[in-house]
Amino acid sequence: MTEELDLWRLAAGLGLFLFGMHQLEQALTQLAGRSFKKFLRQYTAKPVRGVIAGALSTAALQSSSVVSLIVLAFVGTGIVSLASALGIVFGSNLGTTMTGWIVATIGFKLDIEALALPLITLGGFGVVWSAAGTRRSGVSHFVVGLGLMLMGLEFMKSGALIATELFDPAALAGYPLIAFLVAGLLLTAVIQSSSATIMITLSALYAGAIPLEAAAATAIGADLGTTITAVLGALAGSAAKKRVAAAVVLFNVVADTIAFVSLKPLIHFITKIIGLADPLFALVAFHSLFNLIGILIFLPTIPLLSRWLDRRFREDETPLLRHIKPGDTAVPEAALENMTRETWRLIDQAVALN
């Protein structure tokens, strides 16, 4: 019965964390609004700037999926070139590691519950007393989302600590690192969040349930798991969506393969040469480092890669509407830009016929 309660505590913590992340994502998207989309449009003219913009945007919004959605819409309209979009997407991989840094810094060092409960209280009352769509409502959702994420982390942390008392962590030492990689991949594919997988891994590492190298392999698997989401989302998508998804898969497979092959040397570099003795900081540093290595490898190849993707994924047929796409309503600015371009194109055709 105790084991079941511990599993439910871990599961409840994961559910709270995911729901809090969703609230935080929605609130930040609402609060950022046009300014965020304007930032992506204006500051991604070159792939290098796209990488920086992608990393900063994802770190701020705490969601690479939101950034990817907007990027796909902008690529479809021609507002952002494919080369710039690839830079943004690659940068977003680095931006997602910011969650790990924040949690490793405060999530396991402070009394999380003492911080989470006031946030949930204030945010909850704010949501009830604020009109929907207002800035106050957005701030309230942000606060309650942050509180729920912290409370979920506390549940996962305490659940992992109790679980370590029920078995000998040394029993996991016999499993190969590839097993932890596969576990991270499958978990991310199921819960659709690499950040949540990293939080679970940090909790297990903090509790002493798994060693650092096993946690690092799980983090690599979490990165690979995000490619499954990208592939599934692009199966019936447009050519632009398939190009970006293919780039995401290629980037993650190459970066994660390098990270897994060089896992022990990288861990040695972080813990012995840099001197990060704390396993929590060592894990998030490893996660950031191999994503940074991937960016440095792919950045010079972005122009060539974008041209290859353009040739590889072409539109099957010429649509009646050239600029308006089915998914444009997700980003109103992109939809308005599409309508303007389509209107002028139809005017040009009408003039040519007379």
For the regions a protein language model found, what residue spans apply to each?
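Helix-loop-helix hairpins and the membrane-proximal interhelical loops
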Residues: 1-47, 139-186, 204
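Alpha-helical transmembrane segments of multi-pass membrane proteins, especially transporters
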Residues: 14, 34, 38, 42, ...
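C-terminal ends of transmembrane helices
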Residues: 21-30, 71-78, 123-135, 230-237
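Short helix-coil transition sites and intra-membrane helix breaks within transmembrane domains
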Residues: 25-29, 58-66, 156-160, 187-196, ...
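Membrane-interfacial helix-loop connectors
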Residues: 67-93, 100-120, 188-226, 233-241, ...
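Transmembrane helix-loop junctions at the membrane interface of multipass transporters and ion channels
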Residues: 97, 101-111, 129-130, 161, ...
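Core mid-bundle transmembrane helix pairs that form the ion/substrate translocation pathway
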Residues: 111-113, 121-184, 250-254, 283-295
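Non-transmembrane accessory domains of multi-pass membrane transporters/channels
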Residues: 302-354
